[in-house]
């Protein structure tokens, strides 16, 4: 019987998720706005995506926005516009169109800029994807969810879980699209019959039914066609509504036979309708419960096929279960691309999977889960209850654990099994059985419980063989059926064993179905893999048992389930029956055995005997185990106080680390980081103090202290270490070269106090301690005032203190390192340190600071102060093992491992490090292997050092295995002995218990079989009645719901039709109304347009008439104006032309003068001095001329009255003046001579210095050449000796072995003689050099003393002469002033009436005098500049000459050197060729020896194996005698088979070895070929480079010849040009004089013409304006209307009212007393203003004060004044901004936490902030060295109640807006030292903010200057970036909140502290 069920539930459309990436991005063109981001996510290539960007203008003005930085063209991104105007308070859209041509994923920036120079960046994220299908070789996605059995839940909860799983899957799904050609679900037929079969899984006891005969039934793939599901609604076909309309629910009785054809979903009319009255007779024997019988299990064929499951968001697949208590909410089994197919007897179409827009809404279940459970219990009875109880227990376990515990699994290591792969004894084998009829089953699924017996036996057999790895037993046996595509996975790869745990399975992206239920499987079971199958196989018969309630669930989205159009699926032809396999032949002949090399049964080296059976995964796993063991060996013990000499249990260590994660061996520095525990550090301090007070430290330190106090060792006087920050930094860098742990220990011991540090790598803490304790003396500072720190006495004290402590520290660290007071002995110096010796640190310190010291170590050695430590390569070597293929090849780590194993410490001292060459590595490896040989450890496999160095993998792994096996084999033997004894004692008891359990099991099995048979018969009869009743009720209910649905559908259609008609009618009515209104509006608009156009036309006519009248008058006017304009332009053009020519000549003259002036800039200082002298002379000369002229006028006037008296007085006065003039002239000439003599002296001085330098250079070159010749001779002698030694050595190799010792002795003797002679020659040369050096120093000292004497004498004579001249000049000046005063008194009495006339004449004479003096000055300047030019040319010539001489010398030396290099290269190549040939012969002999050894070893192995075989044969014969004839036959057959297998094995071994030898020879040949090709290419390159160099040298020689010729030509040309230039300057001077005269005359004429022109120009505009105004008013009056006149009158009235109102407001404001006081104050200040009280003078005075010495209180007042000025008038501090910034940073760095220093820091930080905000001073304020100071101040004042922290945060905020400064600040604040400071600062700031919030009282107002900003602004306000000039308007001066300030700068710098 069959039934159907129709469920018509309208699907609820899922609301699509809002695409945030496609929403328009908003770009606000204003500061502090959010950054816009435009996303192009997953855009297919060659497709087009569009995004919108809204540019918003929040300001009140229109702005022009331009695209300043567009996207690169290769991205193919186009913009809608590049420039646009954005209105005020409006926005503009920009469309971005992207058509990707390549697959790209990047981030770009689009930069916008407006007319206010405001920039805004838009981040554009571009991500495209390929639209080509991705070929995924993994056709089966990884199973990602475990099979879990849970208690039933409601259907609503089920649907929620499925929907949520689908949503999560969509988020995680990658974009891997399926090929478009595969659009249907299909079954792929195998290419060949199933060749791999497996043993049948046995069903559990409760499932067996021995009373039923098997029958065949068709079985179909899953998902099954929905039309055959008795408990599910079939998929709705396309003609469903028509079918339902034609249905007639008439009861009828119909049965369907076995051979009835398959019913398709479209043939709905053929479905039978169950009746209530129908009586169907069914035989009890034909009706069987849904259980699995053993017969069906034995005969059912099964094979694995694959089909493609494409994407579908929701796929409804029903599960055929009778148990209604199962709810779909429980976790489902993953569904992959591989499913199980059971061949049916006839074809069956697969149902289509239709695509939905979203998941269907959850349906409310018709019945509760409790009711379903009760009904099932009622129907099935006790077996179902047993099943439910058993499933409760199984549901508590994970599927892996349940499957793993099914077999007999001895857990050797007591470890939890996480996956099936770890179960050595669990295997699942499947065989194909004959297909059976499934009469009553709707689905068949495999059961794992029935396979336990077979799996245990199979695994136990494999585990007993020593050839199999226990870990590999459960991996290779599971084989899936062959598939068509060779790249697809096998079925066992799709099992749950691929996932390591439940968590990982849960995360994978899979589709889940519900778990199998054993009680619902009927007569047959489909085979399954080692875990729950990927998809359950479904089968159905014609008489399937129906179910009253439909059960549906949805599959989550996976990579394999992609969207596709619904198409019918194809089923392969089932006419071909699969073949039956008896056993799995692949199980016993596998390609890879993977033996466990670390098993107890493995006694032969597996890496030399069976590597051909190992796959790469197994080898990689073994290498990982070896790496873990080696890292554990070389690791420093965690307990540093442990005894390092205790023997390490190597075998136990390997077992411990094998199951752990790989931990790389830490270095000594990493281990020292954990050395900060209190006990260990205190112990270390105690040992260090004992060492410091020991006798070997006390004596040298005492002597050094005495020397330092006596100033025998002292710091240079010009080095103030406590004030020189640069020198402090240098010393600090030297000290930080030490390891922080050692440095901390040394500082604590030397200074006698503990250093509080967070860790041993706290560099900031160490630096702070050094700066505060080494470069400062707190005792002295506390004893005296702060001014004492600036005195010389304190400087000497601190120098002694610093020098003494540094010397103590270096000696202590050297001794402590040698004594090894730290047990793990870390390096004394850090690895990146440039110095590796304590002696280097001392020498560097002495060269920087100490005075009058040559070699300080020689001085200190006499005091017992000797530094010996030197850090070697092995001290810094990292022994961690990361790659076995590389790490063991140098031999260093291998030697360290041997030291650890053999408890030795003398091996690493013999190493050759760094091991660069192959010989060094071979030596190191031989050293390690030799140590093993000395310990009586024999290595097998002929492992040589060359194999390890060459990276031979098998021999390297064999070496490690032998080391491990050496220590593990005794434990294996002991454990095996214990197990054997125990097993022999308990074996009899085990056999007896097994027999008892077997009898009891058989008895229970028979009883259970009888009970089951009786119960099943009773239950089946009961179930038939209930089944008939339920089917009838279901049919009635189905009819009722169907009829209701049809009625509802008809009602819905009617209602929908009515609504449609209503909408259409209302739309028609509304359309008519709008049409009528539109017609009326159009007619009105046309009428208005007609009137307006008529008015415009009238206006145009009037304007045309008026224009015609105006044109006639304007033509006449224009003609007259044109004539006047042409004439005037002609006259003016001629004048302008003349002026242009004169100006052009003048400009050309000025250009020439300016070009000549540029050459004078280098001597500007001397010229200024000369200019001042010339001006002084000019002034005196002019005064003299004026006096003489006035005297002449006076005598001329007085001669008319008293001629004689006037003549006499004039004569006397003339004589006096003449004498004065002569004296003045003499003085001037004397000054000129002196000046010229000084210039000549300087010139001679420069010539002498140049000659002296040249002489010194020649001397140096000569001495160097002499030294080079000597060294060359020594080199030739040495080379000759070496060649002789090599020749002798080669000859020695050819001699007999008996003379080897004698020749070696002879060679050694020769070497000693050569060394002795060379040393003797060296001493002789050094003595000569020292003598020459001494003589040279004496000569230089005498010469310098003589020159210094001459210089001092010349300066004295010059000073004496100048003093005499000054005295003479002073007396003459005094006399002249007296006479001049007398003369002026007489002159004033006589010439009072004629003063005006004289003034006029005097003005003319002064003008002429000025012109003459100007001409004289120009002449002097020309002469002076010409002389300077001449001097410069002479210098240039001398330099060129000297450079040419130097180049010639260097060139000749280089040529000689090149010849020697070529000769040396030829000899070296010949030597290398001979050596290579000889080494090749040696290597060939060595290989022959190795081959002979291997051959002998193989022969011995064959003999040994044959003897073993004979022994076994004898033993087998003895056993055959003991056993029966049957045992003899079995053993004989086994022996024959073993012999045959051995022959096959031996032949295989021979073939493999031959193949290995051939492959290795081929690889070696290829390697040699590659080396030869490489060397050949290198030789070709060298030849090419040598030939190119020869050509270059030849070209260079030609070039130098041409260059010398060119220099000669240039010299002649420049001399000629200088002559012409001097001539041209003279001509120009004459031309200029004539031009000036013409200019003056022309200027007078120009003035007259210009006056006339100005009069005409002033009159014409007024006339034109009046005329144009009259005409404009006339036109305006013609256009005026009454409305326009009213509007104009209103505007005028409004302007009058506004004018009166504004005047009233201004007058009212002026009555304000404050404004009046300010005005009075300004007027008073203007009257009292003086130049001394100006702001600039105050700034200069403050800067001078700060440059000198000062005290803190005075500096505070000055800095306060500068703070105010830098904020209000920052431009006045531009000239001193660099000094102010440096000074403020220095004050902040030196300040402490006192109140005065706090105020100093506050003022300094504000000054820097004000200067940083001003654009012209920002560059000088930013200093990279100041970042350290700012960071220290932030850390120091972050938790104090002060404005310093907010001010410095504001300063960083201002700096961070510049990209370059932001990068520098980011780099500094992200280094390891600054990270600590930033974290501490953030923590303290947060604590301060929390304390403020928890405080009961409000915090007091800060005493800052700008405290009012907290009232006006919120705590999250950003400070201004521009200077506010003392007025806070829109932004606060600094940050308000400290927490917000620090978070803001961290965000701006993109620093994440978490």
Swiss-Prot record:
It holds the Pfam family ASH. Disruption phenotype: RNAi-mediated knockdown has no effect on nuclear positioning in fat body cells. Residues 836-968 form the Calponin-homology (CH) domain. One of its GO terms (cellular component) is nucleus. Residues 528-548 have a biased composition (Low complexity). CDD domains: CH_ASPM_rpt1, IQCD. The modification Phosphothreonine is found at residue 364. Required to maintain the structure of the centrosomal microtubule organizing center (MTOC) during mitosis. May have a preferential role in regulating neurogenesis. Required for germ cell mitosis and oocyte differentiation. GO terms for molecular function: calmodulin binding; microtubule binding; myosin light chain binding. PANTHER family: ASSEMBLY FACTOR FOR SPINDLE MICROTUBULES. Keywords: Calmodulin-binding, Cell cycle, Cell division, Coiled coil, Cytoplasm, Cytoskeleton, Developmental protein, Differentiation, Microtubule, Mitosis, Nucleus, Oogenesis, Phosphoprotein, Repeat. This is Protein abnormal spindle. Residues 1004-1033, 1386-1415, 1467-1496, 1656-1687, 1690-1721 form the IQ domain. The keyword Nucleus applies. SMART domains: CH, IQ. It is found in: Cytoplasm; Nucleus; Cytoplasm, Cytoskeleton, Spindle; Cytoplasm, Cytoskeleton, Microtubule organizing center.
